[in-house]
């Protein structure tokens, strides 16, 4: 369960670790009801990142709520917030933009963590 406090603390630690590097976050909101209730809090917490990719909401067997999408978080953010429903596109984008020293985080309670190995592989190929 990711709430805004946990996100903020994690991103503060990532910022310290990154030093002069960037913090790139891939966030997958968990449940439509939580996204509806906490969209602004998520946006504020995620602002500690230099670049934020928002995947589609991980429903976790919850029914869709009309009008509630990850774009609520993106719209409350700024130009650093990017809605990207395609996991393949996120991997390609992060792998093409990341530089040595950047910290890349996957956050969420869904299948977002499955992206980490693909990102590592893509970066390994790029910087080989």
Each language-model region and where it sits:
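ATP-dependent carboxylate-amine ligase
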Residues: 2-128
């Amino acid at each position: 369960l990711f709430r805004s406090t946990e996100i903020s603390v994690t991103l503060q630690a990532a910022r310290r670790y990154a030093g002069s590097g960037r913090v790139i976050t891939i966030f997958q909101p968990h449940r439509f009801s939580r996204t509806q209730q906490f969209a602004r809090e998520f946006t504020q917490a995620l602002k500690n990142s230099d670049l934020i990719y928002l995947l589609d909401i991980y429903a976790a067997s919850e029914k869709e709520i009309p009008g509630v999408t990850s774009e609520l978080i993106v719209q409350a953010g700024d130009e650093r917030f990017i809605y990207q429903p395609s996991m393949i596109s996120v991997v390609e984008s992060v792998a093409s933009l990341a530089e040595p020293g950047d910290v890349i985080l996957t956050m969420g309670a869904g299948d977002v963590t499955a992206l980490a190995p693909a990102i590592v592989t893509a970066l390994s190929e790029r910087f080989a």
